[in-house]
């Protein structure tokens, strides 16, 4: 047998993009093999973002959106990683309800396996990415439209709710509570506020306020 000791206690693995290549089409057989491979290679903190659309469905419903509006806000499965990174909305959608439901059951299996191997899954949290209807429902909220990404048309651009706004904290709490109800938690979360997109402002003070609000 070969034994290698890591220099650090925790080893984080994966990023949002890796969930957008072949992973959208993985079933449990692929995931089980991959999780076992991660365990053999000393991964302790795998990113685990599968199934979050069901959580968002419940959150956005509570704010008055219809199921049709919510599923049309999501992209299709092949582009969902970039929707989760706040790059694009709606492209190749709406997201099928059957796919959303199946991903919940898959995520439960993923998390059970990872935790059984002493891993601490890193779950998603709210980055400020909201459907366009939220700006109509809450006209006074600090919501801005994200500038273009990768040449996608204006209809696919995202909206960003500033973490300094009280609505951000309300949505964050609602999301984490529902996610914990569905999937449990290891109290470790990953949030990428501006992935390949422009921040509303590059003023250092504003960026500091955004970071504090998200944290």
Feature-to-residue mapping (PLM):
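Aromatic-lined carbohydrate-binding surfaces of glycoside hydrolases
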Residues: 4-215
């Amino acid at each position: 047998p070969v034994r290698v000791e890591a220099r650090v206690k925790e080893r984080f693995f994966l990023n949002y993009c890796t969930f957008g290549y072949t992973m959208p089409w993985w079933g449990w057989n692929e995931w089980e093999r991959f999780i076992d491979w991660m365990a053999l290679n000393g991964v302790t903190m795998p990113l685990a973002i599968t199934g979050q659309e069901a959580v968002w469905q419940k959150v956005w419903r509570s704010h008055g959106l219809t199921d049709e509006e919510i599923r049309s806000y999501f992209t299709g499965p092949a582009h969902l990683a970039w929707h989760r990174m706040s790059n694009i909305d709606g492209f190749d959608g709406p997201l099928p309800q059957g796919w959303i439901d199946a991903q919940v059951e898959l995520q439960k299996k993923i998390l059970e396996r990872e935790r059984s191997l002493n891993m601490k899954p890193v779950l998603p949290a709210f980055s400020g990415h909201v459907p366009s209807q939220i700006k109509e429902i809450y006209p006074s909220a600090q919501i801005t439209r994200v500038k273009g990404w990768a040449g996608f048309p204006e209809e696919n651009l995202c909206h960003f709710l500033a973490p300094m706004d009280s609505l951000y904290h309300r949505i964050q709490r609602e999301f984490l509570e529902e996610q914990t109800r569905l999937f449990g938690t290891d109290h470790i979360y990953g949030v990428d506020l501006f992935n390949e997109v422009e921040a509303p402002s590059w003023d250092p003070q504003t960026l500091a306020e955004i970071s504090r609000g998200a944290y």
